[in-house]
Amino acid sequence: MINQEVILTKEECQTIIDLNHEFKRSRVHTAQSERALSKSRTSYESIIKSETISDLLLPKLLKYNIISLPEYCNVSRYVEGQWFEKHSDAGYANVHKRRFKTLIVQLSNPNDYKGGELVIWDQNENETISDTAIGNMILFESKLLHQANKIKSGTRYSLVFFLTTDNFKIDKPLI
């Protein structure tokens, strides 16, 4: 199941973008549990402690039974010509074995860039293109294939969390 909803205001998104980020070239996990540069992912990312923004996000995520955030999350930055090819966030068992859901929040105003759509395929290969509204959250199973299309112009920022079952209240059915 894929859930989408606007959960942050324009001002809240800008607050996250304006944090003191140290952007570095994004890396991907390898089968050997290493993080390596790859031609499949050309964006930049800043790893931040989730506690920096948990007070802002958690109250808005409770209805999805999310009761905590992982220790770290990342802010991804895509500029012209950058993308992330089709992949799964639950790729390697030795690295991602606990990833359950992926949560991505669109931080940029969609007028600030062209291209860069987030495309997700469900188990039946049906395609969903994420809403690009500023503050839009998309929550999906980490095993689903997805990609960030190439940015044609401008800059796109997103906030990314990899959730485990530990982050969910489990006395209710999970989404």
List where the protein language model places each region.
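Catalytic core of non-heme Fe(II) oxygenases with the double-stranded beta-helix
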Residues: 55-175
